């Protein structure tokens, strides 16, 4: 993650990060501390794979906690009420027609932290997200994708 970049989030994305942080700090830390305690009880920790595994997991959890805390400090929350439905922006829900396959798809444009292609939440920094930003209903955009170029017609913009 970039050191000085702001993290753009929707309210839903903010809640997801806060929930993950809470889980890591309350539940996961305790679980790992208990595993370390049990591994130490086995005796010599110099060749104790359970201890090594728990310590590695502890380091990963602490690293994730630090990253989440940094993201939350740098968070800029997109207020749903401020989302302009005349043009595509972060937080917009955009219905497009993929002109190559004549298929209608609905994307939500989010900051990179929230992106989840399986939920059709695409990053404003992705090729499709960048191409859609600033467009209006009726616009047709060309997007460079791994297989070449595809065209999308903007059908609807909501929030």
Swiss-Prot record:
Official protein name in the record: Transcription elongation factor GreA
Positions in coiled-coil regions: 5-77
Signal sequence segment: none
Pfam family, one: GreA_GreB_N
PROSITE patterns documented for this protein: GREAB_1, GREAB_2
Keyword Transcription attached: yes
Top-level taxonomic group: Bacteria
Similarity comment: family membership: Belongs to the GreA/GreB family.
GO biological process: DNA-templated transcription elongation; regulation of DNA-templated transcription elongation
Naturally occurring in which organism (per UniProt): Alkaliphilus oremlandii (strain OhILAs) (Clostridium oremlandii (strain OhILAs))
Keywords, ordered alphabetically: Coiled coil, DNA-binding, Transcription, Transcription regulation
UniProt function note: Necessary for efficient RNA polymerase transcription elongation past template-encoded arresting sites. The arresting sites in DNA have the property of trapping a certain fraction of elongating RNA polymerases that pass through, resulting in locked ternary complexes. Cleavage of the nascent transcript by cleavage factors such as GreA or GreB allows the resumption of elongation from the new 3'terminus. GreA releases sequences of 2 to 3 nucleotides.
One Gene Ontology molecular-function label: DNA binding
């Amino acid at each position: 993650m970039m050191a000085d970049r702001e993290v753009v989030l929707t309210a839903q994305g903010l809640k997801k990060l806060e929930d993950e942080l809470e889980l890591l700090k309350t539940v996961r830390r305790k679980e790992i501390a208990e595993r370390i305690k049990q591994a130490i009880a086995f005796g010599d920790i110099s060749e104790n794979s359970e201890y090594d595994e728990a310590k590695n997991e502890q380091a990963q959890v602490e690293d994730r906690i630090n990253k989440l805390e940094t993201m939350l400090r740098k968070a800029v929350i997109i207020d749903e009420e401020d989302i302009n439905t005349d043009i595509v922006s972060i937080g917009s829900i955009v219905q497009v027609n993929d002109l190559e396959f004549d298929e209608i798809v609905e994307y939500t444009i989010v900051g990179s932290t929230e992106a989840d292609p399986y939920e059709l939440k695409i990053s404003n920094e992705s090729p499709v997200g960048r191409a859609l930003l600033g467009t209006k209903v009726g616009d047709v955009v060309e997007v460079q994708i791994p297989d070449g170029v595809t065209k999308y017609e903007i059908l609807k913009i909501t929030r």
